[in-house]
Amino acid sequence: MANVNGVEIDLMPNEGMRTEAQRYRDWKADGEAGGTDVARTRASQILSGNELSADTVVTMSAWFARHEADKQGKGFSPGEDGYPSNGRVAWAAWGGDAGKSWSDARSRRIKKAR
């Protein structure tokens, strides 16, 4: 449990996030493109078994907001040509849909506590 100005906030990644981060690693091992060095670091942080920092959680929420449009791209969803697209691979590195909802909720709490 992280303490943000006296407010306890659980910043431990959840199982859905870990599943997506592992999917990212599996895709990369298979030679798929997508994701930056930061994405690789984020997947490692999610899979580490450690809590994320408050700053990382706020950064994650902002990243998902910027990349929401990637979900409309060709190859984002299973069964589409080009799956997984570069955007889908990167989305997984950051924890996927589970990471988006998790980081959005916690980011709001962190910002309120600050």
State where each predicted segment sits.
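Extended terminal accessory/targeting regions
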Residues: 1-114
